[in-house]
């Protein structure tokens, strides 16, 4: 990203304006020869408590548990005598065992109070300077000695080396007895085989059917049912379509019957979901219609009966009017 694309603060803008007045341009360095810095110094907020030169990746590279084990093991000597086994501590190593990475600078004898380096000693005649090694020798020797002090580096092995040392055994204890823990993988393979046996054939049939449809799209006089019958694929399209049509007819009949009943009563009923009684009545009416279609003679008699029934309530109304 260029410096222009980054949002600049008000202080940065003010400083650039002042520099432009004196002939400065973006991309040029400071100074008479223009060989200075080209970008302004930006403040970085320090959010941790680490000091200068701290390596945050040291916790991943330094195996402190390995170092502590090897350090304690090297400070102990085990000897077998006639009386038995004796364990003694080595007197030469007085340094404490810690989980921090050992460094040569911390163990330097010239360090005073753990923070200052001794440079000279005061005598009556003057100062006696301390001889210091050259910078090149000290840098090379310090790096090598730091690696020697790190006892965990001696046991850094790759996975292949560890497998060879362990004789091909893995971490779990069952591998020592020849158990490879492959039961889960075998179960997964069996599940995949069963799945392919069930659904793989159907997918193949569907693919063949789609290919057949694509081939026969341009042919005249070919229906989908004919294609399915030629291939021998079991389909229920015709059966499902006929059932769907029957259901539509039944719904239309029920709606027409409801409208007729509402017109006879003189008011329109609100559209509500049919109850159980309404469903039963509709079924009875359908059965009656079927009987009428089967026996045409009964159809002629029914209107007379219905007319008689329609006349009876009129007579009752007349009687009521007379009584009034």
From Swiss-Prot:
G-patch domain ranges (all copies): 11-57
Region (Disordered): 1-30, 123-324
Recorded GO CC terms: nucleolus
Amino acid composition bias (Low complexity), ranges on this chain: 131-141
GO MF annotation: an example: nucleic acid binding
Stretch forming the signal peptide: none
UniProt feature, compositional bias: Polar residues: 296-309
Biased composition (Basic and acidic residues): 14-30, 186-215, 254-270
Biased composition range(s): Basic residues: 244-253, 312-324
PANTHER family per record: G PATCH DOMAIN CONTAINING PROTEIN, G PATCH DOMAIN-CONTAINING PROTEIN 4
Protein name: G patch domain-containing protein 4
Organism: Xenopus laevis (African clawed frog)
Lineage of the species this protein comes from: Eukaryota, Metazoa, Chordata, Craniata, Vertebrata
Gene that this sequence comes from: gpatch4
